[in-house]
Amino acid sequence: MCVMDTRERALIRQSGLPEIILSAKYPVCVRTESGKFIDSNSVFLHLIKCQNSNSEIWFSGIDIDTQILFHTVEVD
C-alpha cells in the first residue's frame, strides 16, 4: 500500500465525522491545538458552552481541573 492510499483511506474514514458529532446524544466538541472550538453538537452547546460565548473566554473560565481533564481526553 502506498502513502497516497493510506491518506485517502484516512480521509474516507474521517469524512463521516461531522455527521457523527451532530448525531451524538452526549456532548461532543472538536478543538484545534490552540484550543479554538471548530465544531460541536447541540448537546455540547446547550449543556456546556453557551452558543454566544467566546471560546477562549469560556475555556479560561472553567476550573483548572476541568481544563486538565479536557486536555487529557482530547483525541489527536
Curated annotation (Swiss-Prot):
It comes from the Bacteria. The keyword Cell division does not apply. It is found in: Cytoplasm. This is Protein TraJ. Keywords: Activator, Conjugation, Cytoplasm, DNA-binding, Plasmid, Transcription, Transcription regulation. This protein is essential for positively regulating the expression of transfer genes that are involved in the conjugal transfer of DNA between bacterial cells. GO terms for molecular function: DNA binding.
